[in-house]
């Protein structure tokens, strides 16, 4: 008879995720995961041929957790502000998972920041289109522009170098969100990247 499987695959992934949350993805080794489970390394290799495969599953679980934060943000009265606030909350509460998803070079475990941006756009697109009356391509560009601001704050947070309060960051997000939305809707060709930059800036700075 084959030996009885003591741990299911999802239990091993959950243990590996706990290690990653506490110590980072590079600490997800067979020994550390086995220690988290309180067993030898044997059960891990019942399900996985390599640790890279397990790390890839940890990354997928990190995405699921991140998605929960984003969906909470989208349920608010001002979707993008809610998304931005939840993104920053994720960085504060799960700094190691944030590093895994957003601050690694693309490899077999994580697709890196640009893949995470696309994942985020896919989550937010429908709400932005519906509430802000944007076509899909404009919603994606709008999200990209605002995400770059939020990414900057989140990176300061996870590197423990953020001097701004939650209120200050929220105010910046509101200002930038309003400015970009207004500009995309009122400056012809801006969202498409085909506008007379000199003329637009000239008219703006010459206002009293």
Model-derived features: positions:
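Amphipathic alpha-helical linker/stalk segments
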Residues: 60-82, 120-131
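C-terminal peripheral helix-coil segments that are non-catalytic and often amphipathic
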Residues: 126-130, 163-208
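Hydrophobic alpha-helical connector segments
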Residues: 57, 70-97, 134, 146
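Alpha-helical DNA-contacting segments of helix-turn-helix folds
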Residues: 20, 54-62, 101, 109-117
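Short hydrophobic/aromatic patch on the recognition helix
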Residues: 37-48
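Basic, helix-initiating cap at the start of DNA-binding domains
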Residues: 1-23, 30-32, 36, 53-56
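Amphipathic alpha-helical segments used for helix-helix packing
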Residues: 90-109, 153-163
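Amphipathic alpha-helical packing segments from all-alpha helical-bundle domains
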Residues: 108-133, 140-145, 151, 171-182
């Amino acid at each position: 008879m084959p030996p009885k499987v003591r741990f299911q695959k999802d239990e091993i992934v959950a243990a590996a995720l706990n290690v990653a949350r506490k110590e980072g993805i590079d600490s997800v080794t067979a020994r550390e995961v086995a220690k988290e489970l309180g067993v030898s390394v044997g059960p891990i290799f019942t399900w996985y041929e390599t640790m890279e495969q397990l790390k890839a599953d940890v990354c997928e679980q990190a995405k699921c957790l991140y998605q929960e934060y984003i969906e909470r943000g989208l349920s608010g009265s001002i979707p993008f502000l809610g998304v931005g606030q939840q993104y920053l909350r994720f960085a504060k509460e799960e700094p190691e998972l944030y590093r895994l998803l957003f601050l690694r070079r693309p490899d077999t475990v994580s697709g890196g920041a640009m893949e995470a941006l696309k994942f985020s756009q896919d989550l937010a697109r429908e709400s932005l289109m519906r509430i802000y009356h944007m076509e899909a391509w404009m919603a994606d560009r709008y999200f990209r522009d605002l995400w770059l601001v939020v990414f900057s704050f989140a990176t300061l947070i996870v590197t423990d170098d953020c001097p701004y309060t939650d209120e200050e960051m929220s105010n910046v997000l509101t200002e930038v969100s309003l400015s970009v939305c207004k500009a995309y809707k009122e400056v012809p060709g801006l969202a498409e990247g085909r506008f007379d930059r000199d003329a637009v800036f000239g008219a703006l700075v010459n206002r009293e």
